[in-house]
């Protein structure tokens, strides 16, 4: 896996602090799976 591909994937999964504060850990599962 190239570094650029990893970064673009990471950016797609990125969750803002505000979103996490509002939704809690469940938003991680929605975004990642």
Curated annotation (Swiss-Prot):
InterPro entries: Actin, Actin_CS, ATPase_NBD. This is Actin. The keyword Chaperone does not apply. Its EC number is 3.6.4.-. Keywords: ATP-binding, Cytoplasm, Cytoskeleton, Hydrolase, Nucleotide-binding. Disulfide bonds: none annotated. One of its GO terms (cellular component) is cytoskeleton. Its main location: cytoplasm. Actins are highly conserved proteins that are involved in various types of cell motility and are ubiquitously expressed in all eukaryotic cells. The lineage of its organism: Eukaryota, Metazoa, Ecdysozoa, Nematoda, Chromadorea. GO terms for molecular function: ATP binding; hydrolase activity. It catalyses: ATP + H2O = ADP + phosphate + H(+). It is found in: Cytoplasm, Cytoskeleton. It comes from the Eukaryota. Belongs to the actin family. Pfam families: Actin.
